[in-house]
Structures are given as structure tokens and as C-alpha cells.
């Protein structure tokens, strides 16, 4: 039985304002989720406007198919394929705005069967698209100590990465133990491995669960490819509006927008003529305003918005 979950879109008004919607414009919502941003964009489009939304989660696709609107098209796939989809629909250089709402939607987190959360027992899966790729349980069953440590440290920024990885490997190698296939098993294992001096407000498993989710879904590679694809398909003055949810994502977005706004960097002392420097290219984008965080009121209404950051850039 499928449960019904409420999903509150984060920084909804701010991210849509960042797109500077034109009624007859062409827009792409790279992360449909449960459609909060997409429906808001559609409400601001006129009869000639178009919205293309992307998601690789079958549940999100099912939700999108409820939208009966000739201006709307849903694409099933990873948002890293945005440039490919733009070519398919002849949109390259014509897109007036792209929105990315990174991270996991509330229904994904709240549905125990998806295996994203340590708060509810469920299969240890964590795949954004359950029809492809390897679940976390299968990866943990074969990964070595160094690989598990690296993933937790790199993508979870957890200072106890080695300690947690050792606990997982030791558990796995004990033939008396059940296979590690449930979120509750992994959460308890990590909690037990945490030092008694653990002081953080967050659950001890928070960072490790984040790390495994990012790794199993290749999230950072997806984001990097998606950002570059979005820059390539935007029309002049087209906007890129990106909401991130943790420091790894936000650093990627910040560095990307800074790099695109600076153009090629030529080291001092390299003897190049002005023509040669111009041939290297120029800045592709400019940042719009400052990074925005949710208001105290939004955080109170939706605690999951607390860590979110919105950044906006415009194609030159």
C-alpha cells in the first residue's frame, strides 16, 4: 500500500523569483519531485509558455502524469541528462530558465520502503531510481574497509568514518550475524560505533546515511554534469536557480557559478596577446544577488529547509 506524504517545496517563492518568469518563456524544472516548483512555474506561464520537468524517481513521474496541461512535458531520467533532453526537444539556446532543487524529497525520506531514512525501518536501498543501479545493502556487502571509510569521509564529512567502516566490516564478517539489509540494522550499528563522547545534535547515523546515498546515486557527478548542461542550453539572459541542502552541494554550485562568471583564468607571466586571450573565451554567466537561506518562519513550518541555500546565475 502506498502512503500519502505531504511535501513542502523549499524556498519556493525565492527560487521562482530567481527565474524571472516570462509568460511565453521556456523553462526546465530539473528535479520535479512532487511538483511544487513545477506547478508554481506553470501558474505563471501564459498560453505560449512551456515547462519541461525531469525526474528519475518513478513515483515522481506518476505524480507528474497527473498534470493535464498541454504546456507541460515530463521526462523520465536523471537531471544530468538535461543537455541531451534539450537537444531532443530542440531547446538548446532557447531555455529561459532552469531550476534544480537538489537533495531528497520528503516523500522519499518518509517512505520507509525507499531506505533513505534511519528514522524508520525499511530495506537498505537508497536508490533514487529503484529500477536501476545497486542498493546500498549490496554495495556494503562487498566494499572493503578503505572504500567504505573513503565514502563516509568524502561524502559525509564524518570524522568517525574509519570507526564506522570498521564496525560495518566486522559485523559483515561475523557469520552469526544476519545480512545487513535493513536501515534499522545499519543505524544501530553506526550508533553503537559512535564514541561515548559523541556530542552532535544530529543522530550519529546522519552523516553516514547521507554519504551512502550520495555515493550510490553518484549525486555529485550528476550535479556537476547537470550544471554544465544547464549553462550550455540557456538562452542569453536565461536564469539558473539552484537550491542545495548540504555543504558539499553548495560548494559545488558556488564554485561552478564563480567559474562561469570569471571566464578562463590565465596565470600571471604567460605571454599571450589580447587576441589569444579573447580566443580562450569569456565569462558565460553572472551571479544574481547573494545566496539566500530560508526565513525563520519557513524553517519553523518546515524544519527540513534549515540547511537549504539558493543561488541564482544569469547567462550572458
Swiss-Prot record:
Family annotation (SUPFAM superfamilies): Putative methyltransferase TM0872, insert domain (SSF81799), S-adenosyl-L-methionine-dependent methyltransferases (SSF53335)
Enzyme Commission numbers on file: 2.1.1.199
GO MF terms held by the record: rRNA (cytosine-N4-)-methyltransferase activity
Cellular localisation: Cytoplasm
Keywords (A to Z) from UniProt: Cytoplasm, Methyltransferase, rRNA processing, S-adenosyl-L-methionine, Transferase
GO biological process: rRNA base methylation
GO cellular component: cytoplasm
Function summary: Specifically methylates the N4 position of cytidine in position 1402 (C1402) of 16S rRNA.
Name by which UniProt lists this protein: Ribosomal RNA small subunit methyltransferase H
Source organism of this protein record: Vibrio cholerae serotype O1 (strain ATCC 39315 / El Tor Inaba N16961)
Taxonomic lineage: Bacteria, Pseudomonadati, Pseudomonadota, Gammaproteobacteria, Vibrionales
Amino acid at each position: 500500500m502506498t502512503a500519502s506524504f505531504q511535501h513542502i517545496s523549499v524556498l519556493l517563492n525565492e527560487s521562482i523569483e530567481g527565474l524571472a518568469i516570462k509568460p511565453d518563456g521556456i523553462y526546465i524544472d530539473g528535479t520535479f519531485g512532487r511538483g511544487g516548483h513545477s506547478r508554481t512555474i506553470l501558474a505563471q506561464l501564459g498560453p505560449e509558455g512551456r515547462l519541461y520537468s525531469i525526474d528519475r524517481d518513478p513515483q515522481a513521474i506518476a505524480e507528474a502524469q497527473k498534470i493535464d496541461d498541454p504546456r507541460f512535458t515530463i521526462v523520465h531520467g536523471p537531471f544530468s541528462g538535461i543537455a541531451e533532453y534539450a537537444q531532443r526537444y530542440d531547446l538548446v539556446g532557447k531555455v529561459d530558465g532552469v531550476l534544480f532543487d537538489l537533495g531528497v524529497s520528503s516523500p522519499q525520506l518518509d517512505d520507509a520502503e525507499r531506505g533513505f531514512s534511519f528514522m524508520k525501518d525499511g530495506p537498505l536501498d537508497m536508490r533514487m531510481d529503484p529500477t536501476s543501479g545497486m542498493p546500498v545493502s549490496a554495495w556494503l556487502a562487498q566494499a572493503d574497509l578503505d572504500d567504505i571509510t573513503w565514502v563516509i569521509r568524502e561524502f559525509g564529512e564524518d570524522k568517525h568514518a574509519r570507526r564506522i567502516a570498521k564496525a560495518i566490516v566486522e559485523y559483515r564478517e561475523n557469520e552469526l550475524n544476519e545480512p545487513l539489509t535493513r536501515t534499522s540494522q545499519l543505524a544501530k550499528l553506526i550508533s553503537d560505533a559512535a564514541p561515548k563522547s559523541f556530542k552532535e545534535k544530529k543522530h550519529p547515523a546522519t552523516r553516514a546515511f547521507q554519504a551512502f546515498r550520495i555515493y550510490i546515486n553518484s549525486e555529485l557527478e550528476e550535479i556537476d554534469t547537470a550544471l554544465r548542461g544547464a549553462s550550455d542550453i540557456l538562452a542569453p539572459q536565461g536564469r539558473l536557480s539552484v537550491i542545495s541542502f548540504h555543504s558539499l552541494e553548495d560548494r559545488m554550485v558556488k564554485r561552478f557559478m564563480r567559474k562561469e562568471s570569471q571566464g578562463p583564468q590565465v596565470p600571471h607571466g604567460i605571454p599571450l596577446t589580447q587576441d589569444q586571450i579573447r580566443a580562450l573565451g569569456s565569462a558565460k554567466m553572472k551571479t544574481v544577488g547573494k545566496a539566500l537561506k530560508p526565513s525563520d518562519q519557513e524553517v519553523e513550518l518546515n524544519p527540513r529547509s534549515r540547511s537549504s541555500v539558493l543561488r541564482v546565475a544569469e547567462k550572458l
